[in-house]
Every structure is written in C-alpha cells, then in structure tokens.
Swiss-Prot record:
<comment type="similarity">
    <text>Belongs to the protein kinase superfamily. AGC Ser/Thr protein kinase family. cAMP subfamily.</text>
</comment>
<dbReference type="GO" id="GO:0036126">
    <property type="term" value="C:sperm flagellum"/>
</dbReference>
<feature type="binding site">
    <location>
        <begin position="122"/>
        <end position="128"/>
    </location>
    <ligand>
        <name>ATP</name>
    </ligand>
</feature>
<dbReference type="InterPro" id="IPR000719">
    <property type="entry name" value="Prot_kinase_dom"/>
</dbReference>
<dbReference type="GO" id="GO:0005829">
    <property type="term" value="C:cytosol"/>
</dbReference>
<dbReference type="InterPro" id="IPR000961">
    <property type="entry name" value="AGC-kinase_C"/>
</dbReference>
<dbReference type="GO" id="GO:0005634">
    <property type="term" value="C:nucleus"/>
</dbReference>
<feature type="modified residue" description="Deamidated asparagine">
    <location>
        <position position="3"/>
    </location>
</feature>
<keyword id="KW-0808">Transferase</keyword>
<dbReference type="InterPro" id="IPR044109">
    <property type="entry name" value="STKc_PKA"/>
</dbReference>
<feature type="modified residue" description="Phosphothreonine; by PDPK1">
    <location>
        <position position="198"/>
    </location>
</feature>
<comment type="subunit">
    <text>A number of inactive tetrameric holoenzymes are produced by the combination of homo- or heterodimers of the different regulatory subunits associated with two catalytic subunits. cAMP causes the dissociation of the inactive holoenzyme into a dimer of regulatory subunits bound to four cAMP and two free monomeric catalytic subunits. The cAMP-dependent protein kinase catalytic subunit binds PJA2. Both isoforms 1 and 2 forms activate cAMP-sensitive PKAI and PKAII holoenzymes by interacting with regulatory subunit (R) of PKA, PRKAR1A/PKR1 and PRKAR2A/PKR2, respectively.</text>
</comment>
<feature type="modified residue" description="Phosphotyrosine">
    <location>
        <position position="331"/>
    </location>
</feature>
<feature type="binding site">
    <location>
        <begin position="50"/>
        <end position="58"/>
    </location>
    <ligand>
        <name>ATP</name>
    </ligand>
</feature>
<feature type="binding site">
    <location>
        <begin position="169"/>
        <end position="172"/>
    </location>
    <ligand>
        <name>ATP</name>
    </ligand>
</feature>
<dbReference type="GO" id="GO:0005739">
    <property type="term" value="C:mitochondrion"/>
</dbReference>
<protein>
    <recommendedName>
        <fullName>cAMP-dependent protein kinase catalytic subunit alpha</fullName>
        <ecNumber>2.7.11.11</ecNumber>
    </recommendedName>
</protein>
Length: 351
C-alpha cells in the first residue's frame, strides 16, 4: 500500500472510531432508559400474517391514523414463559428500541396487553433473503459481497455496543425496496461484556465453541458470517446433514469443502472466518473487523458508500405498492385473543 492509500485507510479508521463512540452514547441513553408503551392495539388494522414462530406471529398492519404499514410481532406471554424465553424477549425489545443503523430494522412502537407483547417494526416488503436465494439458486460473488458488506458493518456497529447478534441466517435478512438488507429478529441478541454460555441459534450456523459448551464471545457472529457468505455464494450451507448431531460433528471437525466456482480470494476469506481456532478467526484478532474489511475479497468494496446506501443494489425486489405482501408466504390466519385478566404481569413488567 502506498503512503497516500495508507493515510486514507488510517483516517477512515479514525472516523469510524468517532462514529462508533457517538453511536454508543446514543445507544446507552436509550438502553438505560427504554421507551415503554408507545402505542395501543386499537391503533392498528391487522391485514395479513407474514410469518409464524413457536410463541407468536408477525403480521402486516396498517396504522389507522397515518395509513403507514408496519410489521407487528405479537408474542403470547404464556407461551414465552413456557418456552423459557422471558429473558430473550426482554432483551430483544430493550435492544431494538436502543439501536439505530441503516441495516437494522427499526422498532417504531412497542406495547403489551393482558395476553400479548407487541413490537411494531418498519415493514420491509421485499421479503426474506432466504426466499430469493432459494429461487435464484445462488448469488454471484459480487451480489453476495454486496450483502456481506452490510452485515460486516452491522456487526461492527453491534459489537462496538457489546451486543452479540447470535442468529444470522438468510431467514432473518429482509430485502428492502432499494435492495439493501434489513436485519430482523433480535430474539437471541444479548448485551455481553466478556463471555456468555447460552446454547441458542440455528444448527447450520452455530460456531464450534457454542456446540462444545465453551464460554463464547462475539466471534460467534463472525463464524456465522462465514456460513452466510458460503451459503449465498454456493446456494447451500457449508455444513449440512439430516440430523443436528451430524451437522455439529461436521462443524467441530474444522473441515470445509468449497465448490469449484469459488474464487481463491473467497476461499481464503472463508477459511479465516470458518476457523475453529478462536485465536486465528478473523474478526477476533487484534485488528478486529479490519482484517475482514481489508481482505482481498472485499478489495472493490467502498465501505462508506455501502453505509450511505449509495452503491447500486444487484437486485431490487418486485413491489406493487405499500402493503404488498407478494414476497411473503401465506399462513393460516388466527384471531388475536386478549384475556380479560392480566397474564404474567410480573415477568414482563419492564417490557
């Protein structure tokens, strides 16, 4: 690198430091003093279910006053308690109301009633990366790199706030109208200084240290980034099998095979992300995220332009206007039932 290029790199890294310091101030204000009860169920018209999960559903809703569409996550308090997800759910809301980044879905309102918790988020009409990836088969390397760059910046932001995301997968990445990513589902996100021990995540994306019940840190997110980049560029994940236990055996073995069409730069980056040895895994070394940002596979990436959303997206989802749900699957609709008695008031008092 010439002197001029090195100086430019240096000043960019300095301004990132300043940006993150300011971002942390903003985050901590909201983290220490979370917004509560900022809307009510009656203010929304429920339109259609966009997705379902073990303790709730996400629905497209329309804010009757403004006419704006949102995605409303509805969680059944009793089911959350039964599935021992109280802490995760409180984390999710507390984190979402405090973060602010171009590639994180925005929490617009949150509230609760006798039966449910509600998180009302920006509606991202392009649907999940998962469905586009399955339809197209695999993404070209430039296409995969465009998305990967956004995740790198997002993790750099989250990790600077001591947040681990822990649930990276194509199902949790929505594509917005400009073709950029919105990361959704902070159900497993956690504020951690040092290490944590919870077993959570999706089998194919789990880092070896989680499987081996070791204490782990934010390096698990960089491992998951390796899995995601591989899956985007190959069309299938690096470790897969019929049973989770077989997947886990492959993950901890430290062996990965690459499709012949992968470029040598891509293979090199993935070997450094899918690195079982934590002392060698990119993102976890003394240069932190810069080992990834300065890697040859990202040589053409203009990180600032990505952050400013100035780079032309490789793919814009088809979109027929506000409230269009054609990029989401259909689900059976169900009434939202609200009890006349309060359920689990104590457990969710801080929500």
């Amino acid at each position: 690198m010439g002197n001029a290029a090195a100086a430019k790199k240096g000043s960019e890294q300095e301004s990132v430091k300043e940006f993150l310091a300011k971002a942390k101030e903003d985050f901590l204000k909201k983290w220490e003093n979370p917004a509560q009860n900022t809307a009510h169920l009656d203010q929304f018209e429920r339109i259609k279910t966009l997705g379902t999960g073990s303790f709730g559903r996400v629905m497209l809703v329309k804010h009757t006053e403004t006419g704006n569409h949102y995605a409303m996550k509805i969680l059944d308090k009793q089911k959350v308690v039964k599935l021992k997800q109280i802490e995760h759910t409180l984390n999710e809301k507390r984190i979402l109301q405090a973060v602010n980044f171009p590639f994180l879905v925005k929490l617009e309102f949150s509230f609760k009633d006798n039966s449910n918790l509600y998180m009302v988020m920006e509606y991202v009409p392009g649907g999940e990366m998962f469905s586009h990836l399955r339809r197209i088969g695999r993404f070209s390397e430039p296409h995969a790199r465009f998305y990967a760059a956004q995740i790198v910046l997002t993790f750099e932001y989250l990790h600077s706030l001591d947040l681990i995301y822990r649930d990276l997968k194509p199902e949790n990445l929505l594509i917005d109208q400009q073709g950029y990513i919105q990361v959704t589902d902070f159900g497993f996100a956690k504020r951690v200084k040092g290490r944590t021990w919870t077993l959570c995540g999706t089998p194919e994306y789990l880092a070896p240290e989680i499987i081996l019940s070791k204490g782990y840190n934010k390096a698990v997110d960089w491992w998951a980034l390796g899995v995601l980049i591989y899956e985007m560029a190959a069309g299938y994940p690096p470790f897969f099998a019929d049973q989770p236990i077989q997947i886990y055996e492959k993950i901890v073995s430290g062996k990965v095979r690459f499709p012949s069409h992968f470029s040598s730069d891509l293979k090199d980056l993935l070997r450094n992300l899918l690195q079982v040895d934590l002392t060698k895994r990119f993102g976890n070394l003394k240069n932190g995220v810069n080992d990834i940002k300065n890697h040859k596979w990202f040589a053409t990436t203009d990180w600032i332009a990505i952050y400013q959303r100035k780079v032309e997206a490789p793919f814009i989802p088809k979109f027929k206007g506000p409230g269009d749900t054609s990029n989401f699957d259909d689900y059976e609709e169900e009434e939202i039932r609200v009890s006349i008695n309060e359920k689990c008031g104590k457990e969710f008092s801080e929500f």
